[in-house]
């Protein structure tokens, strides 16, 4: 009986791990910025990678990069709306698995130019808001 329970527990753990979003082979492109240092941009990308692994089951992040200073400036209201003083916008591409992904995404589809909006205050940690 103990062996059966152990096998079931192991199988459940494997299924849980398999359902996570994947960022293993994600490509990043450096984009010049007058607003943010490369370290700031990398921190924002890191926040989205964590978000993707935790919440984007059945998806594989393939590319992510800074959308540019103009795009971030055009989304300035997101900082104000969220009580922050900075906003950064990233764009990405990701693949959706045939099965096991969110029902709001099309199975087997590749999404491109997906926007991620993050905010922060006083140089703190980036927070994904949209």
Indicate where each model-derived feature is located.
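Polar low-complexity intrinsically disordered regions
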Residues: 1-2, 16, 90, 118
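Positively charged n-region of N-terminal signal peptides that target proteins for export
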Residues: 1-4, 8-9
């Amino acid at each position: 009986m103990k062996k059966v329970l152990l096998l079931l527990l192991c199988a459940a753990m494997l299924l849980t791990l398999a359902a996570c979003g994947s960022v293993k082979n994600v490509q990043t492109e450096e984009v010049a910025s007058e607003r943010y240092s490369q370290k700031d941009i990398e921190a924002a990308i890191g926040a989205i990678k964590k978000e993707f692994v935790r919440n984007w089951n059945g998806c594989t992040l393939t590319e992510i990069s800074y959308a540019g200073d103009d795009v971030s400036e055009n989304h300035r209201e997101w900082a104000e709306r969220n009580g922050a003083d900075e906003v950064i916008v990233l764009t990405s591409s990701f693949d959706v698995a045939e099965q096991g992904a969110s029902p709001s995404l099309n199975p087997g589809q590749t999404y491109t130019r997906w926007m991620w909006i993050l905010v922060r205050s006083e140089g703190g940690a980036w927070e994904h808001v949209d």
